[in-house]
UniProtKB/Swiss-Prot annotation:
This is Citrate lyase alpha chain. GO terms for molecular function: citrate (pro-3S)-lyase activity; citrate CoA-transferase activity. GO terms for cellular component: ATP-independent citrate lyase complex; cytoplasm. It comes from the Bacteria. Represents a citrate:acetyl-ACP transferase. Oligomer with a subunit composition of (alpha,beta,gamma)6. NCBIfam families: citF (TIGR01584). It catalyses: citrate = oxaloacetate + acetate; citrate + acetyl-CoA = (3S)-citryl-CoA + acetate. It is found in: Cytoplasm.
Length: 508
């Protein structure tokens, strides 16, 4: 062999970057060992996986939130990182929810220095609103997160991705195993772009595990853990079916708007939100679709059991699923061939070569607040505290032909229709209709909708009239006092800054 290499060097002068052949296993040493060849990705513990990943202080770690309120990966991994002495990390989870309150101590102790997320709720949201972090949290939409990753601003060093099961080479999906969560649309983006991908799995299955949402050629390391998530808690939080008469009234009115909008025809497409009223619209649309002999071409989302029901009844031909919102959706993804998993890039990224939200006819979304310019707040409560998520709100509002916001006029003694929202997440230019329990308002820029709805005999109000009625019922709210300190920056889906969130003054 040495003689052959020497002869080759005499016959051919190697340019810079080229080296002579040195043997089958010279650059693939694992091929020399049968066990190493097949099991080189498997780690005996989470600590081993972290050490092998090459993670260092100051780097960026990422997670997905497909398990929502049942997620166990974020807290498990960050606790281990703290135990191992890591500091100044950037945490980039596709979203954070109530269950992630243990991060508070890790932020205080310097383990986490910066956060990118779509949502903040519960104790974590309260503490960050009170000034917990030195660096403002970066709030992004689901599509906007992909844009930040693709632009290089958000560069993921190590992605820790929880999956119900996988094979020893890393082929994984979210709709198999005892803890199935459904679509891994968020995780697929991280698996594609992270420098190192670590899978945390509950179960091993035989190779090859297909269909694979995350493929073997994307995975560096795998570690088995006891639990990655509780599938029973996927529906916790913002996702809820309703029997509330007020919300059902709003849903019924929203379905009427869809029916007479001009978009309700054979082959239309739709997405429903996760709030009580916006989710309930699906019930009322079913009757109208049957009565008019209409079948939808596709449903997009965030797929829920109500959408699955319409699909299995033949009323929606295809479901495009970037996140499964309940067990029925996870089951359907495994069983129904026309229930298709898509990545968040395909779902809603403005940098995508083809985002499905741009094919939407109708989207129904909820809101914490909406103002007289149709701007929508889904991030902060009436007290100015972080308690929501940007989600796909601005993405789908921008892409859909018809964006309907469903919200009560007031919640308790708090107006939902206001002069100016506390936090602008979705700009009014992409919002078309507001449906409340006291009336319907159409964005004046959509004269076509105004004409269609009036022709159908649907009474309309101006949004200013709704705002004044809300104020009459609740009184004029006392303005919230904020300090100058910015605790969060709201990024629009294209990466631009659309608003900032400041520390509430009495939270010092």
């Amino acid at each position: 062999m040495k003689e052959t290499v020497a002869m080759l060097n005499q016959q051919y002068v190697m340019p810079n970057g080229l080296t002579p052949y040195a043997g089958v296993t010279a650059k693939s040493p694992w091929l020399a060992s049968e066990s190493e060849k097949r099991q080189r990705k498997i780690c005996d513990s989470l600590e081993t996986a972290i050490r092998r990943s090459g993670l260092q202080n100051g780097m960026t770690i990422s997670f997905h939130h497909a398990f929502r309120g049942g997620d166990k990966v974020v807290n498990m991994v960050v606790a281990k990182l703290a135990e191992m002495g890591f500091r100044d990390l950037t945490l980039a989870s596709s979203s954070l929810i109530d269950a992630h309150w243990p991060l508070i101590e890790h932020i205080k102790n310097g383990v986490i220095r910066q956060i990118y997320t779509s949502g903040l709720r519960g104790k974590l949201g309260e503490e960050i609103s009170a000034g917990l972090m030195e660096n403002p949290v970066q709030i992004h939409s689901h599509g906007g997160r992909v844009q930040l990753i693709q632009s290089g601003e958000l560069s993921i060093d190590v992605a820790f991705l929880g999956v119900p099961c996988c094979d020893e080479f890393g082929n994984a999906n979210g709709f198999s195993g005892k803890s199935r969560c459904g679509s891994l649309g968020y995780a697929r983006v991280d698996a594609e772009h992270a420098k190192c991908v670590v899978l945390l799995t509950e179960e091993w299955v035989d190779y090859p595990n297909y269909p694979a949402s995350i493929a073997q050629d994307q995975v560096d390391l795998i570690v088995q853990v006891d639990e990655v998530g509780d599938p029973q808690k996927i529906t916790a939080g913002a996702i809820r079916l309703t029997s509330n008469p007020r919300e059902l009234l709003i849903a019924r009115q929203a379905a009427k708007v869809v029916e007479h909008s001009g978009y309700f025809k054979e082959g239309f497409s739709l997405q429903t939100g996760t709030g009580g009223a916006s989710l309930a619209v699906t019930r009322f649309l079913e009757d109208k679709m049957r009565r008019n002999g209409i079948t939808a071409s596709f449903g997009l989302g965030g797929i829920t059991g109500t959408m699955v029901d319409l699909h299995e009844k033949g009323l929606i031909k295809t479901l495009l699923d970037t996140q499964s919102f309940d067990g029925d959706a996870a089951r359907s993804l495994a069983q129904n061939p026309n229930h298709v998993e898509i990545s968040t890039n395909q779902y809603a990224s403005p940098g995508s070569k083809g985002a499905s939200c741009e094919r939407l006819n109708v989207v129904m979304l909820s809101a914490l607040e909406i103002d007289i310019d149709f701007n929508v707040n889904v991030m902060t409560g009436s007290n100015g505290v972080l308690r929501g998520a940007s989600g796909g709100h601005s993405d789908t509002a921008a892409g859909a032909d018809l964006t309907i916001i469903t919200a009560p006029l007031v919640r308790g003694r708090i107006p939902c229709v206001v002069e100016k929202v506390l936090t602008r997440v979705t700009p009014g230019a992409s919002v078309d209709v507001l449906v409340t329990d006291h009336g319907i308002a159409v964005n004046p820029a959509r004269q076509d909708l105004i004409d269609n709805l009036r022709s159908a005999g649907i009474p309309l109000m101006t949004i200013e009239e709704l705002q004044q009625r809300a104020e009459l019922l609740t009184g004029k709210p006392q303005p919230i006092e904020f300090t100058d300190r910015v605790v969060a920056v709201v990024r629009y889906r294209d990466g631009s800054v659309i608003d900032v969130i400041r520390q509430v003054k009495n939270s010092d």
